[in-house]
């Protein structure tokens, strides 16, 4: 069966939309026409997209719409309908229609969310707790604040990378233009020097010849490198690029601990059980890091205190462990995670400010070395030629 999202008009002239499974598009249209819908538009939802996890921006938009409508007193079914109307992404519209059908069939919102892999498990679990306690709008607000905070940190990281990437790309483009069009002009002047040419000059001359005579090899190599970079980006995200800038590694670690502590804070303050909160917080981290902190959850399951569990993993600093110990002794673990998150946020601000001050001079130094190397390779042979006369 194929999946379709459709929009149409009923016999009363009211705009309607929904999700439909059918063997073909024509069968789907006949089905909808038979149910009294006209002016139909249908979009096929690829089966592979059903396994796609929504990114942070999409989750934030969904939570914003739902929280705003529920806070205004709109019923949940109507809120999902309004959210579908405001959506531009057909895949997300399809999911919302499916969720609305699940609600009409008697499922809770949390059960409907947990049926689809597109939504983070954190959202489904917190909404499940909120439904049992009657605090759905409040918990949606907490989730919205958490994901908006994540989105703001991600945007700050991207802005930090934009400047060096743009400048470096322009430098590479200008360098390639110089090698392809300017270097051949110098080659005709240096043709009589032979082995006396400066080694860097010979490298540039050979590179220029290769780019002009065999461009297809370089184009193929560029496409392969682009595909590899795209694969790395889809696997690791953009954050791996932070390793290329000063302080990038520390920044990534600080961001991970910040998201982890904030996630634990909102889950514990909502009423999620500690073991479940630890499992859900692990999923916010990269796969390799999850394996390193997995002993924390296993130690808590075996009966150890949270302080003892965290002290077993070197990733967590002594200050982190100390704050957790204070939270356990006072019975306010969520407050301890909140203080840890605040400290991590302050640390992140300092790291980003330090990185901002270093990026420009480091980039200028690298470009200066590149320009110096080009000038030396092109003009040193001129001095050797002048010595002959």
Model-derived features: positions:
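A short beta-strand micro-motif
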Residues: 2-10
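A short, exposed loop/beta-hairpin motif centered on an aromatic-Gly-Thr core
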Residues: 15-21
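Membrane-interfacial amphipathic helices
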Residues: 33-67, 239-252, 256
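Glycine- and small-hydrophobic-enriched helix-loop-helix hairpins
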Residues: 57-156, 249-355
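Bilayer-spanning, highly hydrophobic alpha-helical transmembrane segments
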Residues: 152-203, 211-233, 346-389
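Membrane-cytosol interface motif
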Residues: 195-205, 243-261
């Amino acid at each position: 069966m194929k999946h379709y999202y459709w929009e149409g008009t009923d016999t009363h002239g009211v705009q309607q939309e929904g999700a439909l499974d059918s063997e073909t598009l024509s069968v789907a249209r006949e089905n909808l026409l038979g149910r009294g819908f006209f002016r139909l538009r249908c979009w096929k939802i690829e089966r592979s997209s059903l396994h796609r996890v929504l990114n942070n921006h999409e989750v934030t938009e969904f939570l914003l719409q739902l929280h705003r409508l529920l806070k205004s007193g709109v019923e949940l079914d109507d809120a999902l309908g309004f959210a579908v109307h405001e959506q531009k992404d057909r895949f997300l519209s399809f999911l919302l229609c499916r969720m609305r059908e699940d609600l009409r069939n008697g499922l809770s919102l949390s059960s409907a969310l947990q049926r689809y892999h597109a939504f983070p498990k954190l959202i489904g679990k917190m909404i499940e707790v909120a439904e049992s306690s009657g605090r759905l709008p409040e918990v949606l607000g907490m989730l919205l604040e958490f994901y908006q905070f994540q989105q703001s940190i991600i945007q700050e990281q991207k802005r930090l990378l934009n400047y060096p990437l743009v400048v470096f790309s322009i430098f590479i483009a200008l360098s390639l233009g110089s090698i392809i069009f300017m270097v051949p002009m110098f080659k005709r002047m240096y043709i009589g020097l032979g082995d006396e040419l400066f080694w860097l000059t010979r490298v540039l001359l050979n590179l220029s010849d290769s780019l002009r005579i065999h461009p297809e090899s370089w184009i193929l190599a560029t496409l392969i490198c682009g595909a590899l970079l795209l694969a790395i980006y889809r696997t690791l995200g953009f954050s791996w690029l932070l390793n290329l800038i000063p302080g990038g590694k520390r920044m990534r670690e600080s961001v991970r601990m910040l998201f982890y502590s904030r996630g634990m804070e909102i889950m514990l303050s909502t009423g999620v059980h500690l073991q479940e909160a630890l499992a859900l917080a692990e999923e916010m981290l990269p796969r390799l890091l999850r394996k390193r902190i997995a002993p924390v959850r296993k130690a808590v399951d075996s009966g150890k205190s949270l302080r003892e569990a965290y002290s077993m993993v070197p990733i967590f600093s002594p200050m982190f462990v100390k704050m957790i110990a204070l939270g356990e002794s006072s019975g306010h673990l969520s407050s301890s995670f909140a203080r840890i998150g605040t400290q991590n946020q302050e640390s992140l601000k300092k790291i980003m400010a330090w990185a901002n001050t270093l990026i420009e001079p480091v980039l200028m130094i690298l470009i200066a070395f590149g320009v110096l190397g080009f000038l030396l390779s092109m003009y040193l042979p001129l001095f050797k030629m002048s010595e002959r006369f």
